[in-house]
């Protein structure tokens, strides 16, 4: 039941989960949300054996084709249970599962680097990030080491929220670019109640978002974008203009990050309210 201080801002347009970090994920109709985000999101990652860092397409010089791998659970994860195996479709369409005894060898061969599949994040995980030569970014033409939240495979926060209003605004600013949800890897896509085309979620920072009857999120900050948004995946081409447009018009931010105040079920079509 909405309270008097809440305002309707739209509805849940789509839900996305990424079982393995930096691989293509799966679109869902409904999902449980816990204090660690969408159930089963980024539960697995590949660890670079040579550095001990988390493998991430943020450094495409090493991991460019990670985005060409697709990961889906073999069955839906359940609260309180061990995560089920994940089916991985390799770039050449070979299908393997995480429970195979030779999975590390298969993935290492496909990537050209020695990796270990893990469901246990280090206490202080790190990844490498390549910064392209795009004006407005914090760094340019360099690789940095970035800290991740302790004992997780997330970049910054457990939930990423994006509105279709932001996607529509970016399309207006750069009509030649293919701005699609897949490029930005959100968990929750909100379709606004109005037809406004703007970076409307910027104004949600510091406020509370309610999804359906149960889930409440605290919007903590903007989501800074990286080179991953420019990389080819599926039928999407490489396009540095995607990131350049975000940098020129919204400080390289697309979407917002959130923490979970109250978990529960969220479903496609659920009303979204802002407090």
Residue ranges and their predicted role:
Residues 1-275:
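Metal-cofactor-dependent catalytic cores
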């Amino acid at each position: 039941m909405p309270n008097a201080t809440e305002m309707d801002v739209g509805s849940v347009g789509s839900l996305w989960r990424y079982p393995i970090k930096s691989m293509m994920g799966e679109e869902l109709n409904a999902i449980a949300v816990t204090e660690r985000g969408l159930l089963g999101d980024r539960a697995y990652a590949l660890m670079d054996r040579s550095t001990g860092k988390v493998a991430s397409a943020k450094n495409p010089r090493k991991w460019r084709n990670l985005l060409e791998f697709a990961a889906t659970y073999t069955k839906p994860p359940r609260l309180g249970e061990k995560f089920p195996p994940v089916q991985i479709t390799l770039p050449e369409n070979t299908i393997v599962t995480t429970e195979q005894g030779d999975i590390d060898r298969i993935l290492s061969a496909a990537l050209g680097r020695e990796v270990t599949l893990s469901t246990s994040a280090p206490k202080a995980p790190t990844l490498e990030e390549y910064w392209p030569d795009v004006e407005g970014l914090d760094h340019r033409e360099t690789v940095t080491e970035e800290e991740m939240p302790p004992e997780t495979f997330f970049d910054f926060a457990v939930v990423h929220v994006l509105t279709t209003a932001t996607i529509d605004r970016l399309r207006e600013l750069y009509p030649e670019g293919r701005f699609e949800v897949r490029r930005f890897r959100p968990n929750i896509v909100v379709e606004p109640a109005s037809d406004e085309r703007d970076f409307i979620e910027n104004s949600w920072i510091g406020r509370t978002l309610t999804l359906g009857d149960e889930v409440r999120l605290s919007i903590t900050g903007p989501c800074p974008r990286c080179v991953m948004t420019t990389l080819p995946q599926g039928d999407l081409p490489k396009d540095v203009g995607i990131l350049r447009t975000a940098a020129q018009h919204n400080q390289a931010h697309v979407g917002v990050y959130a923490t979970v105040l109250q978990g529960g079920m969220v479903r496609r079509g659920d009303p979204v309210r802002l407090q």
